[in-house]
Amino acid sequence: MMILTKNKPMIVSMGPHHPSMHGVLRLIVTLDGEDVLDCEPVLGYLHRGMEKIAENRTIVQYLPYVTRWDYLATMFTEAITVNAPEKLTNIQVPKRASYIRIIMLELSRIASHLLWLGPFMADIGAQTPFFYIFREREMIYDLFESATGMRMMHNYFRIGGVAVDLPYGWIDKCLDFCDYFLPKINEYERLITNNPIFLKRVEGIGTVTREEAINWGLSGPMLRASGVQWDLRKVDHYECYDELDWKIQWQKEGDSLARYLVRIGEMKESVKIIQQALKAIPGGPFENLEARRLNQGKNSEWNLFEYQFISKKPSPTFKLPKQEHYVRVEAPKGELGIFLIGDDSVFPWRLKIRSPGFINLQILPQLVKGMKLADIMTILGSIDIIMGEVDR
C-alpha cells in the first residue's frame, strides 16, 4: 500500500525503554505528521540463547530456565518442557497429576490475561482497571505460592507429573477464589466494554481478516478474534480437557475490540474449567514413579530416597531416545511449541522453541501502516507480547 505524503517523512524511534513497550522492543516508525507510513520492529534486546543453553542441560536442569521465556505464564513453558520428553519416551501421567496440571495452567492463563488487561487499558488511557487487576492477580499468586512455594517462576511441573501434591485446604481456597472472581470479570465488563471512549480507541483498529490470520501463522486470541475456532486444548486433546465442559471463545471482527472480548471470555471459561477440575479431581499418585524406576534399573528398592515424600524433588534424569517430536500447548498468547530431537543422550540434540509472541508480532508493521501514531500502542497492546519469549 503506497501512502502519499504531504511533508518530508519523519523517523521516530519508539523504545526500547518506552513505558508502553511491554519490554525491550524497539520500533523504528516513519511518520507523516500523525500518520504511520512504515514501522520496523527491532528485536533481540532480551536474547539469551535459550535454545543453545538447552543443548547442554538435562531436561530437569533446564526447567528453571524455561520460566524466563514468558515470565507471566510460567506454568505453560514448564508444561511444554516436560510434555516433550514425556511424549518422546512414552511416559504416562497419572490422572490426579493431569488434573492438577489443568488447574495450574488455567490459573496461569487468568493471571496472564489479567496482566494483559491492566496495561492494555492504561495504554489507551484508562487507569482504573490497572489497579483492579492486581488485586485479583495477587490472589492467584497466593494460591501458587501455597501450592508450589513460589509466586512466579514456579518450577512445579515434573516429567511424569508434578513436583508436590496440593496442600491441605488448597482446593477449598481455590474454589473460594473462583466464586469471588467470576463477578469481578462482570465488573470489568461493566466498566470497560460499553465505554464510548474505549470503543472509539479499539473498534476497527488493527483489523486482521480470517485469511490473513491463517496466512501469517497467528495463534491464540489473535487467531480466534478473526473468526477461526482453533484451540489446541480441543484440537490436540492433551491432559484431561476432553473430560470437562467448556467452549472455545471466538469473535468474527478481527479488530482490537474482538481480541479484548476473546480474552475476557477466556477468563470466564478458565474459571469454569478450574471449578469442574477441582470438583472432579481423583485421588492417587501425583507423579509417575515408573520414570524413577527406569532411572534406578534393577537396584531399585521400595524405601529408597527416590520414593520417600520430601517436598519438591527433581525428576529423574534419563536418556532421550534417538527420535524427534513436536509438542504444543495452548498458552495465553497462542501456540507455544517445542521441537525436540533426542540423541541417546541425557541432553537434547536440538530444542527449537516456537513462541507465539514472536510469530504474532510479525504482523505488526502491516497493521499499523496507514494508522495514527496513537494507534500503535492500541494494536501492540492487543497483540499481547512478552519480550522474554519473543527474543528467547
Swiss-Prot record:
Pfam families: Complex1_49kDa. Gene3D superfamilies: Cytochrome-c3 Hydrogenase, chain B. It catalyses: a plastoquinone + NADH + (n+1) H(+)(in) = a plastoquinol + NAD(+) + n H(+)(out); a plastoquinone + NADPH + (n+1) H(+)(in) = a plastoquinol + NADP(+) + n H(+)(out). Its EC number is 7.1.1.-. GO terms for cellular component: chloroplast thylakoid membrane. InterPro entries: NADH_Q_OxRdtase_suD, NADH_UbQ_OxRdtase_49kDa_CS, NDH1_su_D/H, NiFe-Hase_large. It is found in: Plastid, Chloroplast thylakoid membrane. Belongs to the complex I 49 kDa subunit family. NDH is composed of at least 16 different subunits, 5 of which are encoded in the nucleus. NDH shuttles electrons from NAD(P)H:plastoquinone, via FMN and iron-sulfur (Fe-S) centers, to quinones in the photosynthetic chain and possibly in a chloroplast respiratory chain. The immediate electron acceptor for the enzyme in this species is believed to be plastoquinone. Couples the redox reaction to proton translocation, and thus conserves the redox energy in a proton gradient. This is NAD(P)H-quinone oxidoreductase subunit H, chloroplastic. It comes from Marchantia polymorpha (Common liverwort).
